[in-house]
Each structure stands twice: as C-alpha cells, then as structure tokens.
C-alpha cells in the first residue's frame, strides 16, 4: 500500500498544477492530507502501532512526568514534515499555469485521487480499526465471563512483582542478542516460563499492561472520551483487581516506581485498587537522592531496585503478608538510559554501539541481583517472584531488528514450591498474568476478570482467545464491557455531590462534563475535553446532558451555582439548577416546562492567570489588558480553584484599548486565587498584562 500512497501523492501534485481552477482549494486539501500524514508519522514513531488506543488514552491522560526530551529527534523530523506539508500552498503561489482549460475534469480527478490516497494511507486503516473498537456493541454475551476471585487463600505467600519496562522476552534470542540477558535467561530455567505471550488491544502501554495483568481487563476508558484522569474521581471503580483481592485477604500492597505516578493515571489506578503505599519519583527527591541519579523519566533503576530491596526487608520483618510491586524505567524507548551502577558496563554487539542494548544488559543484571537477594534471604522461601514485561517494546533504536523476530512478552514465576516448566501458550496474553499467579497461590483459583490461568488445561473462554480468533471480531465486546467499569451500568441519574463533582453511576467526575446517551438512554459517550465544542457539534439521536456552572448557559447568572442543560432526541431542552442537581435528575424523565429552538452556544472557562496565587483578605482592583478579545461583553471571575468557590464575578466590556477593571473583595485569605473568563469555543482572549492591586481607601481630610 505504501507504493500506492506514493503514486497517489505524486499524481495529486501533478493535478494541482495541471489547472488553475480551484487551485487554492486543491492546495488546501493536499496540505491538510500531508499534515495528517505527518501527525500519523510522529504518533507511529511513538506508539509503534499508528493511532491506536494508547494514543487516544495519552491524549487525555495526565502527561506530567513524561520524558519528552527523549523524543526530540522525532519531534524535529515532525516539524520538518509539517513545513513540507505547506509546500502545495507555496507551489500554487509560484507556479505559472500553462493550461487553463479542462479545470472541471482536473478537479474531479484530483478529488478522486485524493480519496484513493486516503484509502491507501494508514489513516484509513487506523480510523477503521478505532471505529470497530469503539463502536457500540452488545457485550451481554461476555458478561458471564467476567469473574472475580472469591475464595480465601489458605497459604498467604508474599509476592514481589517486578515489571521490566519494555523488557520483552524477544531479547532472550541468543542468535540475535548473544549474551544480552544471561541472568534472566538463567532464571527462566528455574521458573514457570510462559511463552508466546501477546499484548491485546488495550494492554500495549505501561498503565494498560499493568491494568491488564492485575485486573484481567483491557484498559479502555469512560465511554468514548479516552480518559482525562485528573477529572475522574476513581480509576475503574467497578473493576476488582489483584490488589483489591489481596487486601481483602489481609495483604499489604506497596508500590515503588522511579517515574512520576501521576503520568497516565498510574498512581490513581494503584490507590484505587488496594495499594496502601505508592512511592514514585517524588519519594526519591524527598530522600535527597542526588540529581545524577535521575533521567528525564525519573530515578534510575539501580537506586530504584535498592529501594525495593530495603522495602522488601521492611515488609518481611513486619510479618504481614504483602505484595511489593516495582516498575523499572531505564529500558524505556527510544534509546534507554544507563545508571551509574552500569557506567563501566558495555554490551559488544555486531549491531553496533547502541545505548539501548547497554541499558537492557544493565537491567538484566540489576533485576537478577534483586531476585538473588530476595531468594537468598531468610524470607525467600515464603515469597513468589514475578518478572514480567509491562508490554512489548515500542519504537526504539532496535525496532528494525525486533521487526524481524517473533515478538513475545516476558512472564516468569519463581518460588520454593513452583516446579520449573516452560508453558507454551497458543492464545495467551498479559490479561492472563494475574489469573496465573492466583492459581500458583491457590490451585483452585483460575480466573481474574477476563483473564484465565495459563496453567489450566481446561480454561474456559477468555478475552485472549477472542482477540486471537477470527481477526479479533468478537474482542470489541470485551472492550465494550470494560468501558462500563468506569461508571457502572446505572447511569441515568445525575447529581452534584458536596464536593461539586457530578456523580454518574459509581463514578465522580469534575465538571464541565457532557454525557451523550443513545436512543434507549444508555450512556454512550462521556466528553471531558472541549465540551462546549462537542455540545455544539454533536447531533445525537438520543439525549445530551451538559453539566457546568450556570454561567456557561445564562447571561444573568452570577451565583456560581451548578446547572445541567438536558436536550432530548426531539431537541426539547430544560435547564436544571443547583437544587435539582443536589437531589438528582433523571435524564430519561419527560422534559416538562421545556424550551424549543436552536441549542444555545454554551460558554467555557478560560484561565487568564498562569498559576494560582496566594492572596490576603482585603479589597482589590483587578486590571488587565486584553490584546485579543471578544467583540461582545463577557463574564470575568475570581475563583478559588481548590475550594471551587466563585469569589467575585462581573459582566465586562473592554474599552478601546482592551482594558478591563473589576473590583474583587476577599473576606478571608485565599491560597489559590485564579482569574478566568467565560467564552464560547469560537471566542478567544489574550491577556498582555494582569494585576491585582490592593484598593487603599483615601483618608477623609475634611
């Protein structure tokens, strides 16, 4: 298909200059197509699989803690491609057209070839894949397959679960990587060594791999929004994961990782599912670890695994059964990182001096040393050790080599009473890792979520089998059910709780939020980003419910209360106010006292301050100058972001110079004062200068 795409692009360029008719339209369409291809190229270099579920997840999840500097080369190439995408516009500007006739036929040919190019491009493939994965499907047939562990553990052994970042078993291949991983290869001969372990859709990046292995479900999101983790109160609240079960069995669950736990919602997941302690990069900063032990992603693995060893000893001495989970980081794509403990260690390879190979060699040694420490300790006999890759390696400096190999995840189980064996799976995935561990703990237990023990010969149907059978045509049913784990299935009643969060089923979401229901009033989509734009552009056959401050919907609302605008499938509308939302509203109730007509263009808050500021009590005058501003009046507010309180609000009209003046009175000191404007999504405001000046009364001299 690549040659077809290339040919279509060349023909599109020729058709662009073949006739001056509609030349700018043709150039704009071609530039847009090239721009989308450039974006796809960047995403593909980051994900290794084009635009997939991981891409959508990270577009919405918290990106704090991402080592963006590692991808500067990819970003530089993308900028170059971005500039190249504009070349059709330049070509139209400088080209002198020689054949003014036949413009209609040329334009028709251009449109036809553009459609061919789109069909031949990876954009069409990925769009089609996402459509089939995210489209509404009936998941009723797979509901009985979702099973949670119930029976008690008779032997509560300690567990140490070591996730190796992108440390797939493919690196064990001695023909391709001789002597690269001698320590883990040796441990594999003493362990239950699971082979041919795949990553299904929804398990192919770090947080997804952890969710899949510990919960037995693929990581999807609140239906359709691909997850804004900073706005969700709970991470998969309806799922019952390994940490939940072990906590009920009297375990203490402890996590230590080198990266920022807020990245992609990892910390939220762990704290929502039975983990008592979550230590991340901030823990090591608090311990005073020197800067030389950190990379762009967090603390290096030598420091991390030393801390894991200390934690293991502390937890073991306490006497309470525990699961200690750790996640390495230095083998992260694209090039890996080398900690100080391995600075003198090199891996000689015919492939060349590749930094990632040195990092993998180091990780093999450091993990091997931690495992040896645990096994040789007086607590080792009562400990099961799990060594697993979180997912297959993403695009890295070895991608060309890995592409020629049979890829498989790493999964080893080591323990005193665990007989070494190699388990050859035909349709196993990381969804089955947790269930396999449970069978090793308690032989009668073989299921966790949609996961099935890979040691059970009579395992019932599973999501892993569905993903590998008939091109995965039944797998979207599992994805659809997994999406309901974010909110539950009773989602027709909405209310605002005391914290100002919207309660949807079992989930709590910080507004603004737009909920789309299908014609049967089943929750179809939750929008958490660009909600006002989505509300304006979503043409639903069911019901829409938009929850935000009343200021979003009304010109005369200055009380800071919450409102919900409900639009049914007949386009009848009703605005519910704070008292109604506190009691709860049913989105499937008939809309009495409704209004008809076009939907209002709702406003959204735009922050004017760069950061929250501590402000003492008193009277102030807010002065700001807006270089770019709406042509009509709009609301400006002073708010306390954490307490979610509107402190002052005024309907403002900038003067000719763009100046806005507004009094702000504070009865008490505020730790987190912010200034924001309410605009619809087509409007913008750009503030050049902003000052909050204390209003000092003039003394009476009479």
Swiss-Prot record:
Top EC class, one word: transferase
Localization: Cell inner membrane
Keywords, sorted A to Z: Cell inner membrane, Cell membrane, Membrane, Transferase, Transmembrane, Transmembrane helix
UniProt-listed InterPro entries: Alkaline_phosphatase_core_sf, OpgB, OpgB/LTA_synthase_biosynth, Sulfatase_N
Major subcellular location class: membrane
GO terms, molecular function: phosphatidylglycerol-membrane-oligosaccharide glycerophosphotransferase activity
Record membrane topology: Multi-pass membrane protein
Keyword set includes Transmembrane helix: yes
Catalytic activity: a phosphatidylglycerol + a membrane-derived-oligosaccharide D-glucose = a 1,2-diacyl-sn-glycerol + a membrane-derived-oligosaccharide 6-(glycerophospho)-D-glucose
One Pfam family cited in the UniProt record for this chain: Sulfatase
Record EC number: 2.7.8.20
Bilayer-crossing regions: 2-22, 71-91, 103-123
Pathway involvement of the protein, from the record: Glycan metabolism; osmoregulated periplasmic glucan (OPG) biosynthesis
Keyword Transmembrane helix listed: yes
One Gene Ontology cellular component annotation held by this UniProt entry: plasma membrane
GO biological process: glucan biosynthetic process
HAMAP family in the cross-refs: MdoB_OpgB (MF_01070)
Free-text function comment from the UniProt entry: Transfers a phosphoglycerol residue from phosphatidylglycerol to the membrane-bound nascent glucan backbones.
Family: Belongs to the OpgB family.
PANTHER family for this protein: LIPOTEICHOIC ACID SYNTHASE, PHOSPHOGLYCEROL TRANSFERASE I
Protein name, UniProt field: Phosphoglycerol transferase I
Native source organism of the sequence: Xanthomonas euvesicatoria pv. vesicatoria (strain 85-10) (Xanthomonas campestris pv. vesicatoria)
